[in-house]
From Swiss-Prot:
Highest taxon in the source lineage: Archaea
Subunit structure: Part of the 50S ribosomal subunit.
InterPro entries: Ribosomal_eL18 (IPR000039), Ribosomal_eL18/eL18-A/B/_CS (IPR021132), Ribosomal_eL18_arc (IPR022947), Ribosomal_uL15/eL18 (IPR021131), Ribosomal_uL15/eL18_sf (IPR036227)
Keyword entries, A-Z: Ribonucleoprotein, Ribosomal protein
Species, as recorded: Pyrococcus furiosus (strain ATCC 43587 / DSM 3638 / JCM 8422 / Vc1)
GO MF annotation terms: RNA binding; structural constituent of ribosome
A single Gene Ontology CC term: cytosolic large ribosomal subunit
GO BP, sorted A to Z: translation
Organism classification: Archaea, Methanobacteriati, Methanobacteriota, Thermococci, Thermococcales
UniProt protein name: Large ribosomal subunit protein eL18
Length: 120
């Protein structure tokens, strides 16, 4: 059976945008994130805020090529960019003093991807 990729038009647009920016700025991180978002939904990343709290440092930029979920607590001030956020995850990130932004907003702020970590 032929692999078709994601059918969500917004996700397809984001993947094209990531590839374009990867070529434009000559950085591989955005191409890697695009590849991870292209995977089937059942293989896409689902990260709880407790995992972000465990592995991220204060002030760090984290990109999640999938969903951020609200299980656990977050005590660090981090910038998290993801495809989707649950309501509780977004609330917990903001309450901890961090930011919950889209992947496009992260690329606008940091087009070269320096200091950005991918978390799955």
């Amino acid at each position: 059976m032929k692999r078709t990729g994601p059918t969500d038009p917004n996700l397809r647009r984001l993947i094209r945008y990531l590839r374009k920016k990867s070529n434009e700025y000559g950085v591989k991180i955005w191409k890697d994130v695009a590849w991870r978002l292209e995977r089937p939904r059942r293989q896409r990343a689902e990260v709880n805020v407790s995992k972000i709290n465990r592995y991220a440092n204060d002030g760090e930029m984290i990109v999640v090529p999938g969903s951020v979920l609200g299980a656990g607590k977050l005590e660090k001030k981090v910038i998290v960019a993801a495809w989707k956020f649950s309501e509780t995850a977004r609330r917990k990130i903001i309450e901890a003093g961090g930011e919950a932004i889209t992947i496009e907003e992260l690329i606008e702020r940091n087009p070269t991807g320096s200091g950005v970590r991918i978390m799955e």
